A protein has these predicted regions:
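Residues forming the flavin
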Residues: 1-422
């Protein structure tokens, strides 16, 4: 059993995705107190939204559930959801941070009976499914959310709808009087594990995302395939619910582009290959075409690339697609571009197009900003001269889940060193 190290300066971990959870657990199990904050109503981050993830292509529920159990059993971890970092001051070993707490309007008495959702008539876009379906404004974030507790959308709090939700709850779990608050903490080190956002595909105007319903992004594809997704795992066209028969993937949609993201996000190629297997396993008569600039499939995952290439239903075409147009009557999509290898002009029709958008790091957005080093793309860079605040996972570079876990462990050790030095 780890010794408990006496200090009134816990480690603050910002971000409750797989990197933040890992950093918090590693530090706490080494005997240090940790405060973990997450801006959404649940822990698990982007990994919770995956259907399968590398390297074993298994669902995320098992791995996350084990980590949640470890967290619940460890008294040295305190976690806060719907919490955001508002300010940082001080230096290594002696920081003062302000944390903004947004109201959930549902307290610890919630039993997830769902009666509030039953009486609620207002619907909102489902953030967990990237807006591909609608949910009640009194909702459980998703089926294995941690903490397992409902949330009220602010839009109904001051309405009769909110009062109906409150009145139907026999456990007095709904409090419509809750307000935004702030707390101040003294911490010894900070692990910034705030993760990433998908690049806004609507900025790549010539691909029509947001205007053409059958143009979706890679993160949306992940939700389409998931059993707890908007279609209960059925991979169908968003416009009409028809089974897909001919799907295109466009790699580097907004990446390696001087008008958008200059860098490669590294894992998008493998993600699209994974999605291609989702489709061909579910629809054996469906053809998949992957349009790419270069394929990135490094180390042991190259074997997965080799396996996908042998699938007769999957075709790789070296091309940067120039434009997508839609047939209004059918919703079919016409892709135009050039085959880089042959110089041949491409004009092909598809049922659905998936854009492989890049990963954009979530930066530390407080005023005044702390003295941390970032590269020209906004990814945090470790500077030995600037200790005390450490990046973990995808805020440092685009990486997969396994690499994020390794990186978060290293960041936790760095944070411990900052406390020990003081």
């Amino acid at each position: 059993m780890a010794n408990i190290h006496s200090t009134n300066r816990p480690i603050l971990v910002v971000g409750g995705g797989i990197s933040g959870i890992t950093a918090a657990l590693e530090a706490a199990e080494a005997g240090y107190h940790v405060v973990l904050i997450e801006k959404s109503p649940y822990l698990g981050g982007r990994v919770a939204q995956l259907y399968h993830y590398f390297p074993k292509l298994c669902p995320p529920q098992c791995g996350l559930e084990i980590n949640f159990r470890r967290m619940k059993q460890n008294p040295r971890i305190r976690f806060l959801t719907m919490a955001e970092l508002a300010s940082i001051s001080g230096r290594e070993g002696d920081y003062v941070v302000t944390i903004k707490l947004l109201p959930r309007y549902v307290n610890e008495r919630c039993t997830c009976c769902g009666k509030c959702a039953e009486v609620c008539e207002t619907e909102i876009d489902n953030p967990f499914n990237y807006g591909m379906d609608r949910i009640k404004a009194a909702y459980l974030p998703h089926g294995f959310a941690f903490p397992m507790r409902y949330v009220l959308d602010p839009s109904i709090v001051e309405t009769e709808e909110g009062k109906k939700c409150r009145d139907v709850c026999e456990y007095n779990a709904i409090d419509l009087e809750l307000k935004e608050t702030a707390i101040e903490l003294k911490v010894g080190a900070i692990v910034w594990a705030a993760g990433w956002d998908p690049y806004d595909a609507s900025k790549v105007e010539y691909y029509g995302f947001g205007n053409y319903r059958n143009v979706i992004t890679n993160v949306m594809m992940e939700r389409l395939a998931a059993p707890n997704g908007p279609t209960r795992g059925k991979i169908v066209r968003p416009s009409d619910g028809e089974c897909v028969k001919n799907v295109a993937f466009i790699q580097c949609a907004g990446s390696r582009d001087e008008n958008h993201l200059l860098y490669c996000s590294g894992i998008c190629c493998l993600a699209s290959m994974k999605h291609a297997t989702y489709i061909t396993e579910q629809h054996q008569d469906c053809n998949v075409t992957i349009f790419f600039i270069d394929i990135r499939a490094l180390d042991r995952l190259e074997d997965f690339y080799t396996k996908v290439k042998t699938n007769e239903k999957v075709t790789f075409v070296k091309s940067k697609i120039a434009m997508i147009t839609e047939e209004e009557e059918t919703g079919d999509l016409m892709l135009e571009g050039e085959n880089t290898n042959t110089g041949e002009q491409i004009r092909m029709k598809f049922d659905m197009v998936v854009l492989a958008t890049g990963m954009v790091p979530n930066r530390i957005n407080v005023d005044p900003a702390p003295d941390v080093s970032c590269d020209e793309y906004g990814f945090m860079v470790h500077d030995p001269e600037k200790c005390g605040i450490y990046g973990a996972g995808c805020v440092r570079r685009p990486v997969d889940v396994a690499t994020s876990v390794q990186d978060a462990t290293a960041s936790a050790l760095k944070a411990i060193q900052s406390i020990v030095r003081r």
